[in-house]
Amino acid sequence: MDTHAPYDKPKRTPRLPRRLRPLRLLAAAATAALTLTAGLTTPLNPAPQSAQAAADDGKDVLTVAVAQSVDSLSPFLATRLVSTSIHRLMYEYLTNYDPKDNRAIPGLATKWEPSADKLTWTYTIRDNSKWSDGKQATAEDAAWTFNKMMTDDGAATANGSFVANFREVTAPSPTKLVIELKKPQATMAALDVPIVPKHVWENVGDFSKFNNDRTYPIVGNGPFVVTDYAADSFVRLKANTSFWRGAPKFDELVFRYYKDQDAAVAALRKGEVSFVAGAPALTPAQAASLEGEENIKVNDAPGRRFYALATNPGARAKDGEKFGDGHESLLDQQVRQALFMAVDRKTIIDKVFQGYAVEGEGYVPPRFSTYHWKPTDGQKLSYAPDKASQLLDEAGYKKNADGKRVGKDGKPINYRILCHATDPQDKAVGKYLQEWWGELGIGVTLNCLDNVTDPWLAGEYDLAFDGWSVNPDPDFVLSIHTCAALPATPKDTGATDNFICDKRYDELYGKQLAEYDAAKRADLVKQLQSRLYDTGYMNVMAYPNAVEAYRTDQIESITTMPRDAGNIYGQDGYWSWWSATPAAVGEASEESSSAGVIIGIVAGVVVLAGVGSFFGMRRRASAEDRE
């Protein structure tokens, strides 16, 4: 959970994500931003000194400017990429991803193996991982985490799809975890769930409301420990010197929220921040302005996100009750496909992204070639406004004397599109939609909000700009379109992205989840994308590049993922921030940083018995995005 992306539990607010359906943080927490210490630079109180100099005790501080605020510090609730990225730094997962090629490698588990029938999986839990309060991390912590998700709907909010097929989870010993399945599950080496300390979390009452932001430092066993947090302002972490892979090289890591991304870029120029991620990437203008700047490096890499228009298919809950106010014409597949054909993707790539993106088609970006899908020539809904107009006529939505397309109620059709107020791409594409769909006789109202979550969850929209960070194993971002992801009742928060519930899609989803053969599963995932494309519910317009920048006089070296032409922010792992070397050290090169990552990886051994090439598959790790 982009997703999950989610810009992660791949962007999602619903796009400012990896993952699903955050609960609102207490508004009062935002006032904490006004009481920051003098040594901390914030958008509300910028300081002239560099990010590293901001720590008056001489510590090396890496400050990351982000375009998302944290939705929750609880790994059971968080869906935004910034939140799930922080959770990867706070907690270990059973497995991790190799930063070179995305293959499954040891995390909290040193090895894992299935039974002959693939229904029982045994994980060996490492004995050298400790919680930051000094207690040993054990298999009991993992078993408790999974069991809580299996028995508490609140704890299953973000990542419940991973445990839905679990029959029983036990910890026969401190280093042995056993998971019994109801039926085969191909994601058992890709369980993207943060493992939490039982002795801390067993004291939590309502998991649906607890945001893990009451006591600091927050107990974890990842490379960093959260020491402070102010809503809509910052998250501060310190290096975990007892981390089993070795301590990070930076003493502190700060994620600082900037609503205005031009201000974030300006802060990078001044040296007030070390790194800027963008919203979720730098705009072409921002990237161009930084190219050639002294001590600044722009990283432009193929992205793991898709950028889409999500259609409200008629919001409903599992209990069958309908809610929201989506336009009734969008229930017609022919109308949805007509809207597809009235979107010029080439113009969006050339004019909006200015080449920093690839034209969208399937749900999984081309970066993940195993699962990437393209429609056939006869299937592709190419830009053809005349054909789109014809489809609308055939569907019974014709123009009146004023040239306005009218609905079955005789009123002119006007679609409300949810738009992220902080995302310039949303606004730019929205203007094109007003032009293109206006030629069809359809009105468009852009509803650009700081918080799109509330109307989205309420089903009070017609279409919405959407996007998730997809992971090497795309199961999570596929699961959010199943009927099982719908909320139990209209008052509940489900894992669904945009209320899709399609029987054929569900059948294909179940088949891919149970398929251990890598090639057969990849084919089923492509069939899923084909089905999603044909329904017209998700119009993937682009795959944006990961465009980001950092100061080379503050960061000597940092690991990208994948190693060749990869991103830094929002990785499927903690490699970037864990490996980052302060420029003041001056001895580490990019190669030595990467070597450190390799050394940390080969310390573990993966048992592949009985599964063949399955573990060689690229798997999911975050939205994101989880997002």
Locate predicted features.
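Gly/Pro-rich hinge or "lid" segments in bacterial periplasmic/extracellular proteins
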Residues: 193-248, 252, 385, 390, ...
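A structural "hinge/loop" feature
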Residues: 66-87, 108-110, 135, 188-196, ...
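Alpha-helical secondary-structure segments
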Residues: 63, 138-145, 178-180, 222-223, ...
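Aromatic- and charge-enriched surface segment that lines or borders ligand/interaction sites
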Residues: 110-155, 178, 255, 264-267, ...
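Detector for C-terminal structural segments
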Residues: 2, 34-36, 230, 304-307, ...
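Extracellular/periplasmic solute-recognition and catalytic clefts
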Residues: 156-159, 168-170, 227-241, 254-322, ...
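Surface-exposed binding/hinge segments that line
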Residues: 57, 124, 158-204
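N-terminal lobe/hinge region of extracytoplasmic solute-binding protein
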Residues: 65-116, 147, 217-219
